[in-house]
Amino acid sequence: MYDIIVLAFETDMTRVVTFNTGNEGTGPAVPEIGVKRDRHSLSHHNGNKEALEQLSRSDEFNVQQFSYFLDRLSKVNDGGGALLDSTVALYGSGLSYGNSHGTTSLPLVVAGGKGIGIKHGSHVDYNQQTKGFDGYGNGIGVYHSPVNSKAHFSNLLLTMAQKMGVEVD
């Protein structure tokens, strides 16, 4: 699928794509890489070692595929440089801790967009920017209420849209 997306961008058939590697609610089992159960059932692992290993394999596979996509974008010239530099790609999950459906501290990666002002080379943990935050070791509570209530996922999406030239407030 990533090859088709690159081709669509390269030929200017579209400038926007949304692609899910699997439904957030189920996500397929991938027996070829040793993932025997769907992502949803694995996310409710309750600390089960086998489930956690399969979840890790699934995550690793998906990140490798995303890396492949970025590499392909970096090798295509769009006339002004690498296609990756004029593309913003977001990878991540709508849950930070699937065992309890935690929706804060989302694990997200923003890639590309160097040519439109996206700065890279850092890890941004919005919780660490909050006075009094003393780490994630305080248990599951951090996944249910954000430490930094001003760090909204919608702000990231808004910034991405604005960088791509969409006029929105």
Where in this protein do the model-derived segments appear?
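Ligand-binding pockets and gating/stacking loops
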Residues: 1-169
